[in-house]
């Protein structure tokens, strides 16, 4: 597989063993260039071992195909992702193969694992390829791994692996001025220990020939001239505000700012023990969510979300507060009127605009293929339903499916990793010709024949814009931006265009820096980053020692009943927090049906949902770990009563006491009744 001249130009320092970032537009062949570097590395370096890191599960398979084609069967290659189920340990596979392609999370888990079969040292590898390397910042997994690399460098550990970063969009890091953007690019280079960012200087004409950009069009529409459904939702929210008696609370309903405000109110009310105020805030957030859905898709979708919430409240809550009874009655009294307005109100102008785009694109081109990007899984589901029901699109050959995240935050809206791979394959072979996607499909997805990309009412940064645009790779393809005139989304897209230019200027400025000045700057940034990380680690350790575990009580976030102590908690696999006190089972119920996670874990499987026996609040799920049943708790389902007052932690890693690791053998010896014989 021969490389193009611009690919040769950007990889030359990497072939000499230098750490570089390859900066090429989407679709210009970064992966192929990296595969060639890996091949030459395996040919020329004694005992070479390569790891390719990706940040999306579906890219593991895609990159596996590209690297195998390049390596032509001469070296052993394996791919690893979280959905593989039972497998040999990561460390064992690393020792037995020449090249591994895996998600960064798996490598990070292996670096910290105490098990010999699983554990691996970073220095086992002689080359690390970091795909979509612009994610190497702050506390991302990429940056956690590279921080360990920099610590080894500071200790003068030898030999260190070579690092090859790949990106189409380094970004500006939120900077709006050139100096800030340059500092962001330099920080990215420091994080990846980069000798130079490489982009074509002498072969630009050939690059332009092979990476033509789609035609961009702004498809803008007016707001609904009348909105009786939205008006009624706001009227109901006004009534809830009247009960709250908090005149200082903003009433800018249907905005992200309002959402942030009521989230803060619910958290503050929980800490203060104001149960009714917390309930009002939680319900106001659901109404606000409905307004946001209504703005994005249809009124019937917004109503369905509200109905789903109130149905769950009816089914799960076993203790009803006066405020909850009032709120349930308020919705029940007006739900028929809402249903009538939802089905008889005006169409969303953004959907009318989207219909025109799809009719034009899918009627005029041969074998069209497109992707609609939207913000949330909820809106993706709603858009797919609209596509299937819209009369005006029934005469057009549209075969659509979802492509959304594999997370498990909502059983009704997530996709499994296997589902993702199947959908991508069907899209690539033409069985499907339209994807309704969230950001999971923005990066790396290689669909050469995709000729239309629609960004539907999105408020994102310049990296997201560049990545989504890059999915349109066919000749004469179209990139359509759908938004309301004068909206925040439109203003942000225009800012993104300016930031893309700023990013290009910043990279050019870094490339032109004197090498000695550049290297000195990189060293300073690396030292500062390691010092900051060490200080943060020390601060977290101090925080974990703030209170003795036995002096911290666990309270249900909803009914405030005390259900355990910090000393009851243990960590499984370093992340899952379980309560091992046998008496804890007196405080919760377990659903009969297990939680559905279509992903096979190495040592555990999910059991049922666990919820507060007193009030019905969902706390988490039951984990069956090596045949032992353990209740896994969500940190946001618990309040912590400390000697200095109540707190609500956003992450278990931020709680003010130390949680020891789970000891399987000790637990089995002490709690034989927990064993599952299923």
Swiss-Prot record:
Q: Tell me the segments the record calls region RNA-binding.
A: 572-655
Q: Which reaction does it catalyse?
A: ATP + H2O = ADP + phosphate + H(+)
Q: Which GO terms describe its molecular function?
A: ATP binding; ATP hydrolysis activity; DNA binding; double-stranded RNA binding; RNA helicase activity; single-stranded RNA binding; zinc ion binding
Residue positions binding Zn(2+)? 556, 559, 612, 615
Q: Name one GO biological process term.
A: cytoplasmic pattern recognition receptor signaling pathway
Coiled coil location = 489-546
| GO CC entries | cytoplasm
Stated consequence of mutating residue 634 to E: Abolishes RNA binding
Which superkingdom is the protein from? Eukaryota
Q: Does the keyword Nucleotide-binding apply?
A: yes
Expression by tissue, per the entry, reads: Expressed in testis, nerve and spleen. Also expressed in the brain.
> Which CDD domains would you find in this protein's record?
DEXHc_RLR-3, LGP2_C, MDA5_ID, SF2_C_dicer
Mind listing the UniProt keywords for this protein, alphabetically?
Antiviral defense, ATP-binding, Coiled coil, Cytoplasm, Helicase, Host-virus interaction, Hydrolase, Immunity, Innate immunity, Metal-binding, Nucleotide-binding, RNA-binding, Zinc
Induction section of the entry: By interferon (IFN), virus infection, or intracellular dsRNA.
Residue ranges of the Helicase C-terminal domain?
350-514
Its top-level enzyme class, in one word, is hydrolase
Family annotation (InterPro entries): Helicase/UvrB_N (IPR006935), Helicase_ATP-bd (IPR014001), Helicase_C-like (IPR001650), P-loop_NTPase (IPR027417), RIG-I-like_C (IPR041204), RLR_C_sf (IPR038557), RLR_CTR (IPR021673), RLR_Helicase (IPR051363)
Q: Record's family?
A: Belongs to the helicase family. RLR subfamily.
Annotated domain remarks: The RLR CTR domain is capable of inhibiting dimerization and signaling of RIGI and also facilitates binding of dsRNA.
Q: What does this protein do?
A: Acts as a regulator of RIGI and IFIH1/MDA5 mediated antiviral signaling. Cannot initiate antiviral signaling as it lacks the CARD domain required for activating MAVS/IPS1-dependent signaling events. Can have both negative and positive regulatory functions related to RIGI and IFIH1/MDA5 signaling and this role in regulating signaling may be complex and could probably depend on characteristics of the infecting virus or target cells, or both.
> Partners and quaternary state?
Monomer in the absence of dsRNA. Homodimer in the presence of dsRNA. Interacts with RIGI (via CARD domain), MAVS/IPS1 and DDX60. Found in a complex with RIGI and IFIH1/MDA5. Interacts with ANKRD17. Directly interacts with ATG5 and ATG12, either as ATG5 and ATG12 monomers or as ATG12-ATG5 conjugates.
Spell out the protein name for this chain: ATP-dependent RNA helicase DHX58
> Organism classification, top ranks?
Eukaryota, Metazoa, Chordata, Craniata, Vertebrata
Q: Which gene encodes it?
A: DHX58
